[in-house]
A protein has these predicted regions:
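Bacterial N-terminal signal peptides
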Residues: 9-19
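Alpha/beta-hydrolase-fold serine-hydrolase catalytic core, especially in secreted/extracellular enzymes
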Residues: 26-121, 286, 293-402
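Glycine-rich nucleophile elbow surrounding the catalytic serine of serine-hydrolase chemistry
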Residues: 225-236
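Alpha/beta-hydrolase fold nucleophile elbow
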Residues: 215-227
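Signal peptide processing junction and immediate N-terminal pro/mature segment
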Residues: 18-28
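Cap/lid segment of the alpha/beta-hydrolase catalytic domain
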Residues: 130-215, 251-267
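Positively charged n-region of N-terminal signal peptides that target proteins for export
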Residues: 1-5
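Mobile cap/lid helix-loop segments that gate and shape the active-site cleft of serine hydrolases
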Residues: 243-288, 295-308, 314-320
């Protein structure tokens, strides 16, 4: 069992380039001062140097597995409380709608929706493997904040990700954030004050939806998303232990807390009782398999020397340090481009026991996406003139009752 000294050394030794200046003491005092009210930590709320000091403070609160589990439980409770999901709301009927199956090479796509709360619909697409029998792994694919007519779950890179995973045997659900895709089409705005609550709850209910389908293995649930979808990935994994494998992409950072109110607009990171950051929240995945994918061109640039060593130390308490990995692309920028998908696929194959036959080129190690069909936005939509949205759907922008 490793000691606190080891935990601190893992971060401090790995980051010789990030020296904490003496003048930081006063500034740091303001950051650590306790307040009766929760504090919102948004965007670049603290510097990289302050993040290292914070990691040291947090590591000082535990030195063994029992103490880490106790802290993890407090973090989990703080996330749910801050998101106004504590206690967890009653599971209301999903009333799922799945329609318009399209068959392609090795997989099918269907348009789908369910009610996360009465009248509040979550829209998405189901990708399923063809020619596979028995229960299959289920994978959730939340999306990031990319806008435009083909933004969110409608993006070609999101379709490639889902189709490729389905061709390898997974049942994949790609779904809208509030105010994106079909949600935006029907009038919802991403600035909805309950966005963080709604998206976290929608992700929890998305697991319920997968498990209700009848062909998904309840014990093999994975989730992967990029940017804002990366935030959803580690928040969901932190609060719902049904997730067995997680791959957050270009989002796990000790110094960046998410720039959108749907990520950091509610007090999930800092209260008078406890401070945390997204690096530590991602560590709540332990001891389940976790892969961090990071780049040199955004706030995940320090992953190899800061976030990964901190998280791996926690996996060491479970004696499973090999279950957390990272792939770092020092010369690349933000996004879920092909290189990042190629880093994610083998991790999902390994831990969800997917079958890459017909997709993976064993000679080159490349997962072939050329067999995927990129669909039009109109095809991806769940409701249209012939299939209107149910009349009891909430008016766009309405407060959602919990």
């Amino acid at each position: 069992m490793r000691t606190l000294t080891t935990a601190l050394a893992a971060v401090a030794i790995a980051l010789p380039a990030l020296v904490v200046p003496p003048s930081l003491a006063a500034e740091e005092k303001d950051k650590t001062a306790k307040d009766d009210k929760p504090i919102l930590c948004q965007g670049h709320w603290q510097s990289e140097a302050q993040a290292i000091l914070q990691l040291k403070r947090m590591a000082a609160t535990y030195s063994n597995l029992k103490e880490w589990k106790a802290r993890a439980a407090k973090i989990r409770t703080q996330i749910l409380t801050g998101a106004k999901l504590n206690p967890l709301p009653k599971r209301t009927p999903l009333n799922p709608i799945v329609r318009n199956k399209r068959s392609y090479k090795g997989y099918t796509v269907e348009s789908a929706a369910f009610e996360a709360r009465p009248g509040f619909f979550v829209y998405g697409n189901l990708y399923r493997p063809l020619g596979r029998k028995g229960d299959r792994p289920g994978i959730l694919c939340p999306h990031g904040h990319a806008r435009g007519p083909e933004g969110g779950r409608l993006r070609p890179d999101q379709q490639h990700r889902c189709a490729t995973l389905a061709r390898m045997g997974a049942v994949v659900f790609s779904y809208d954030m509030v105010g994106f895709g079909d949600s935006e089409h029907f009038g919802w705005n991403h600035k909805h004050p309950q966005a963080l609550t709604l998206q976290t709850w929608s992700s929890i209910r998305a697991i319920d939806f997968l498990q209700s389908l009848g062909d998904v293995d309840d014990e093999q649930i994975g989730v992967t998303g990029c940017s804002g979808g990366g935030t959803q990935t580690f928040l969901l994994t932190a609060v719902d232990d049904r997730v067995k494998v997680a791959v957050p992409v270009v989002m796990v950072s000790a110094h960046f807390f998410g720039g959108c109110h749907c990520e950091s607009g509610m007090p999930i990171h800092k209260t008078a009782a406890l401070e945390t950051n997204n690096c530590e929240i991602a560590a709540l995945t332990s001891p389940r398999p976790l892969k961090l994918i990071s780049v040199g061109g955004d706030w995940t640039k320090n992953t190899p020397k800061v976030e990964f060593p901190y998280i791996q130390n926690i996996y060491g308490y479970y004696e499973k340090p090999s279950l957390v990995e990272y792939s770092h692309f020092a010369d690349e920028g933000h996004g879920y481009q092909l290189s990042k998908r190629q880093a994610m696929y083998p991790f999902m194959v390994k831990h969800l026991k997917l079958d890459p036959k017909g997709v993976l080129n064993k000679k080159t190690g490349v997962f072939d996406e050329t067999g995927n069909r990129i669909e039009k936005v109109s095809t991806l939509r769940t409701f249209d003139e012939k299939h209107p949205i149910p009349k009891h759907a909430l008016k766009p922008g309405s407060p959602v009752k919990f």
